[in-house]
Structures are given as C-alpha cells and as structure tokens.
Amino acid sequence: LISDLRPPICNINSLDYLLSKLEEGTLCTDLTTLKKMIEDYNDLNIGEGRDLLLQIFDKMESIYKYDNGGNYLKVDSLAEYEGDFNILSETARESIERLAEMFVKLNTNVKRRGGRKNSLEEYQLKFIGKYGENCSIPFVEVINKDAGIGFPEYYKGGEGEAIELSDPIMQMFEKKYEEALLNGGHIEFYSKDLDDFQTDQSNSLDSFELNFNIKIINNDVKLYLGANIGSGQAGRSFGRFYGLSETVRETIKNLNHQNNTNVELSFVPKQIRLANVIQNYSDESYNTSFFTTSWDSENELRLEDIYIRYSDGKFHFTTIDGKNELKFTMNNMLNSDSQSRVLRLLVDLSEFEYGLSHWSLFPWDILAQERVYIPEILFEDITIATAQWNLSV
C-alpha cells in the first residue's frame, strides 16, 4: 500500500510528517499529545525520564497495540563530552592513511572468483551482446526478462565469492601465517609488502570509512579495526546521527560529490521493523524512493527516468539526456542483498565499478575459514584481526 501517510525515510521527522497529513480527529489529537510527551522526555536529564517513558509506551499502546509485544519507541542517548577527542598522534594518523591505501590496493589487486564478481561480469557480457556499447537503454527495459536481460544469475542464489589461492597477495599471507606459527608470534605486514601492487586512481572510491575501537594500554593508544571494517562511502555508518556535527556533515558532502551525481535510495525495507534503523539524513541532490513517499518530489528520479549504458569498460547510469552520471547510494548500513532485486542492482552496479563488492572478503578471512588457529594480525601497529580459535563442538 502506497499512501502519503507513509513518511519518507530520509530527512524527515516521521511523527511531524504524519501529523501534517492527518485531519483533526481522535488519532491526530492522540499523536499531538504523544509528540508533546516525547519532546518533554527529550528535555529531561538521563535518569529522570523513566516514569514519563512508561507513560509514552502506554500512550502508544493505546493507539495501536502489538499482538506479540514489541518496541514502541527507539531512544537515542547523546553524551556531552567536554574533554579532548584529539587522542590520536600524527604517527597514528599516518598509520591509518597507510591502512586505507592498503585496502585500496587489496580491492584492486586480489584475484577473486565466483559470487557477485563473476555474475556481474557475465551480466556485462549479456548487456553488450544485446545492446552493444555506448548505447543508453531505459533501465526498466533492461531488467525486464522478456524485453531485456533481466537480473544477474547470482540473485537466484549460488556460490559465494572466494580468493584464488594462487593469488600473490594470498600467498604472501600464507607465508606470514606459517612464520608466525613457527615463531610463536603474530602475523604482521607493512606497506612495503604491497609496493609491487598499484592502485587505479581513475577507478576507485571517492571516499570510504574505517571503523576502529580505540584502547589506551600502558598510556599508549592502540587501534583495533572494527568487526565490520567500515563502509564504502563516508557518512554511511552515521545514520540518523549524521546531522549532529555541521563540520563533519560539510566535509562528507564535499567528499561524496566530487565525480558523480549521487542519488539517495530511500525505501521501506522488506523487514518493516528495520525502518527505524535505516532512518537517516542525506545531503544528496536527487532521490529515488521505493515503497514510500519522497522527501523531495521535485528532485526525485523515477525508475522510468534512469538510463544505463556500457562504455569504457564499465556500466554508467545516466538521466535521459545523458548529461548526469548517476551513482546510487544508501546512507545506511543495511545489506542491500536482503532487499528487492531492483534496488540491489542499482547499488551493485554503482558500487561494483569502484571495488566495493570486494569490501567484505580479504586474505585473512580465507585463513580464518580454513585454519584452526589464527594469531593476531597487524598492519604495522594497527590490529586488523585479533587472535582466534575455530572450535567444532
């Protein structure tokens, strides 16, 4: 059901939007009261709002009661910290920059097989076979299995992506793993270990994020790469907290608007309860909405407005006039593989050309799959994977 009562996911206060669409009546009165209660709760100090929060839950339950319970309200806590966040030394910053360069080199040079990579390469060949190169085709025609070529075979399910064991970088990790076991130490590699490998500056991400856990051990700052590593676009992991820092917001906006016209994909996910998680803010000029209303209908690109062509060795999304190069993005951390095939293909083809489809598979992941014990893995002085045992029960 598509209704203007269903609020946009981006750049909108959902409750304010809903109130603006409702006429005066019992529901509107109840929601206005609820809005005031939430605002009063937000003004309280941490620890003072328990009773009011329970009243809010009761009010929401009186409006609509979940049959099997559920969370009626998400509560975000913001801690004001007056200390110094500048705890990273210049040496640590330089190490992070070298780590970022290392990831770019791995994305460019590691040889992979199977999974998304092979499937999208086959999709390229099918497209060229039917339409040729340098020819812009309506996207809705391409994905029509009768008139076009449908969707990649990988979307039907299949083998996952793997790294070729003959890959030189994989072999280097294998050698360092064996040395670590013999010496009883950890696996450590350096920028110089990848000096023979180049990066393709014309075909790399405009920006990406790295996620770290920071610990102070014996007065020294120690960096641990986060379990999810990061994301393929600056700001994606910020979600609904994106607007808390205007300085950070402007920096991210400048990074992401260098080479393409970014189009934010705003959608209600298949798992409706995840809509709270992906509610976010976006500075993109254009948007394409799925299963919900647009926050900016004047700058919305419908599926019928999107064209696709293959040229210069890769796919390009454009508008009908071919002037704007489009890149479809999601300013959230939801895995697009779990969503509709149309949305998934827009993201995959936008990101595949920039190596992002390889973001979650690295040589140390292969080691962890095949070995009983993996020592701590360091890139220079940064821990990218802690020691682990693989136990079968």
Please report, for each region that a protein language model flagged, where it lies by residue.
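C-terminal structured domains
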Residues: 224-393
